[in-house]
A protein has these predicted regions:
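Ligand-binding "clamshell"
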Residues: 31-43, 56-58, 130, 135, ...
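A conserved helix-loop-strand patch within extracytoplasmic ligand-binding domains
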Residues: 43-92, 195
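Short amphipathic alpha-helical coupling segments at ligand-binding clamshell hinges
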Residues: 66-68, 177-188
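Periplasmic-binding protein-like
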Residues: 80-87, 189-209
Length: 239
């Protein structure tokens, strides 16, 4: 969708002309709410579009050598996702807290002295014959003739920071979260039938989001809170 079209669709949900929309991630939704004064909320996480590491002159990550070059997108969000993926695969280490705003200046450890070549996202795939590896999002990988499912050497998983942040969601107007129609829509888009369709149709460029990733994160937070509460209770008992 164009930015103008997506704005229209969000306003139609706000006005009640539409019940829901499904084409955006939460940071985009939150930004729109803040800017436009709307009241849209997320009711279901459906899919994400993973970044992947693809072969250039090297065909496997085990072939990485000292001084190799890896091409990544140069815009803020996409570069951060690329760097996080490289970190997840042991190629670099980023400074603590760099997260989804990371840049090459946040690289804390680079044991192979890898050179990061920053390019416009649409240019990255074109330099594959000249660099060891390229890091691409799904649509540019498909445009370059890669099969995301077959050719990516590594890709973002549902439990990655990027996937949990940039998962595409169903959005509704606040107050309509418990509507039976909305619940049915969410259940349908989370069904095994839809997951199978996504997997078959998009060849890995779009991946169904697994709610277990969020559940695991919630469990960790709950465990922390429980531990803190137990500690306070123990201290009070001791007093």
């Amino acid at each position: 969708y164009s930015s103008a079209a997506s704005d229209v669709y969000k306003r139609q949900v706000e006005s009640g002309e539409m019940d829901a929309n499904y084409f955006q991630h939460v940071p985009y939704l939150d930004s729109f709410n803040e800017e436009k004064g709307t009241h849209l909320v997320e009711v279901g996480k459906i899919h994400y579009e993973p970044f992947g590491i693809y072969p250039g002159t090297k065909k496997d990550l085990s072939e990485l050598a000292d001084g190799d070059t890896i091409a990544v997108p140069n815009d803020t969000t996409n570069e951060a996702r690329a760097l996080l993926l490289l970190q997840d695969n042991g190629i670099i280490t980023l400074k603590d807290g760099a997260g989804l705003e990371a840049t090459v200046n946040d690289i804390a450890e680079n044991p192979h002295n890898v050179k990061i070549e920053e390019l416009a996202a649409e240019q990255v795939a074109r330099v594959a014959p000249e660099v060891a590896f390229v890091v691409l999002n799904g649509n540019y990988a498909l445009q370059a003739g890669y099969s995301v499912a077959q050719d990516s050497l590594a890709y973002e998983t549902s439990d990655s920071e990027a996937a949990k942040t940039y998962v595409n969601v169903i959005a509704v107007k606040e107050g309509n979260e418990e509507s039976e129609a909305i619940k049915a829509l969410v259940d349908t888009l989370k069904s095994d039938e839809i997951k199978d369709f996504i997997n078959e149709k998009y060849d890995g460029a779009v991946i169904p989001f697994e709610d277990s990733a969020d559940a695991d994160a919630d469990k960790e937070e709950t465990a922390d809170v429980t531990t803190d509460t137990e500690t306070e209770t123990t201290e009070e008992a001791a007093e």
